[in-house]
Curated annotation (Swiss-Prot):
Cofactor-binding details, from the entry: Binds 1 Ca(2+) ion.
Keyword vocabulary terms for this entry: Calcium, Hydrolase, Lipid degradation, Lipid metabolism, Secreted
Tissue expression: Expressed by the venom gland.
Protein task: PLA2 catalyzes the calcium-dependent hydrolysis of the 2-acyl groups in 3-sn-phosphoglycerides.
Cofactor(s) annotated in UniProt: Ca(2+)
Any one annotated GO CC term: extracellular region
Primary subcellular site in the record, as a coarse category: secreted
Protein name: Basic phospholipase A2
Claim: Hydrolase is one of the keywords in the record: yes
Subcellular location: Secreted
Lineage, broadest ranks: Eukaryota, Metazoa, Chordata, Craniata, Vertebrata
GO MF annotation: an example: phospholipase A2 activity
């Protein structure tokens, strides 16, 4: 999902 993608970016 879009939210999951955003969280992935923040983790980096």
């Amino acid at each position: 999902s879009l939210l999951e993608f955003g969280m992935m970016i923040l983790e980096e």
